[in-house]
Amino acid sequence: MKRTIFYPLLSLALILMAGMTTVAHGQDFNGTWSGVIDVGQPLTIVFNIQQTSDGVNITWDSPDQGVFGLPATATISGNELNVDMPISPRATFKGILEGEALNGTFTQGGYGFTLNMSRTGKVQNNTRPQEAAIESDTHRPYRNEDVTFTNGDIIFSGTLSLPDKGSHFPAVVLVAGSGPLDRDEEVLGHKPFLLLADALSRNGFAVLRYDERGVGATVGGDPGAPSEPLATDAMAALRYLKTRPEVDATQVGFVGHSEGGLIAVMNAAKHPDEVAYIVSMAGPGVPGKELGMAQTQLGFKAAGLEFGEDLMKLNEDFYTIIATEKDSVTMCNKLANFFHEQEGNPALQLYLKGVTPEQYIKLYALPMVRCVFQYDPAENLKRVKCPMFAINGTLDSQVACENNLGTIKRLVPHATVKAYEGLNHFFQTCAEWKGSANNGAIHETMSPEVLQDIVNWLQQVVKH
């Protein structure tokens, strides 16, 4: 659920902008260029270049991460190509064209990597077989309806999936993780909420999924809002479902992923008479400080890096400031002082992972980020009275499986909890620890076992 920069490199906090560049003259850079950088593991970088009479169009791909057509700008002068990639941390490439070779340096966050490229054929996009199977099925036993509902002056747009047979359906609202995200919770080409809606609707549930504030067809609202206002959005969705004649108004609940699991717990605690059941998929059970500290450690583990005592001390001091300072200005000032005091500490640059202190401060000053790491779910978890299913993958590098599930079970004794061996934060099957930036390289969007377990658990709950 962390809304931060991933390590190894190539965070996908993209700035969407036109890929038009300038060109001085003559050299032929046309085509698809591919090469590999070594960031502790091989990572393929691809530039797609088309020279025109008006200039040059350029996009770039990171196929190992499953992302394609990313925006870039560039300048060409003689046989030199300079590319700027507006990601965070910012990345650049400077290369020299020598025949059919384009050799240079890829730089991000102050680190430079040799990148020798050759002209190649078009790199194929990774397939998403689970989505493809759903989208190609012309005989689905349910129908999809475009719907709108409101929360204050925000008009939310979503998709309501209704089974073809029967009536008076139990229902769920799907609540996405840290975003803002669309109704499918699409990340790196994966659409986990499409899969959940399909699985549940095939098994007798009405399912509502919606574009979050400022996303897709939803009109209004701050896309950077913290969790509490987002929880009111989810309640508006649930209350809309209760107005539908096809829905059993006594059997409506939430399935939330990551921050969506946090929101499901919030609403179950605050509105016990309205929320019939909740499923928390990698939702947090521990306080925000503990969550953040574990995320950083797991990120280093995923990158194959040691996390010694010096880094542990930096980590604890950093998250203590974030967790305890409720005033944003005070927090930012204390973080600035913290980084200044640590300038001579050799562990600091390793901890920063190529990101500047200013970038860190700016990120954690965002309300939608700060709220997560200042939140302690304990009181809300203790107040959950409805049936609850809490799940985690053992290779989750964002919400540590053992601590979070253990805490949830302790605070909600009646909850059903399950840990899935070898699954990551998105419930994809992984062979080993990987950072979140690797999720796009995995063809699987969600483990079929997880999908079936959620269906089975909900079916058992609504029977009682």
Write out the residue ranges for each language-model feature.
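Central antiparallel beta-sheet cores of small beta-barrel/beta-sandwich binding domains
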Residues: 27-98, 103-111, 141
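N-terminal cap/lid segment of alpha/beta-hydrolase-fold proteins
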Residues: 124-167
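Short beta-strand element of the alpha/beta-hydrolase
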Residues: 168-178
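Conserved alpha/beta-hydrolase
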Residues: 195-217
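Alpha/beta-hydrolase active-site loop
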Residues: 224-245
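Accessory cap/linker subdomain of secreted extracellular hydrolases
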Residues: 279-379
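Short beta-strand/loop motif that positions the catalytic acidic residue
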Residues: 384, 390-392
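Short alpha-helix in the alpha/beta-hydrolase fold that links the catalytic acid
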Residues: 386, 399-410
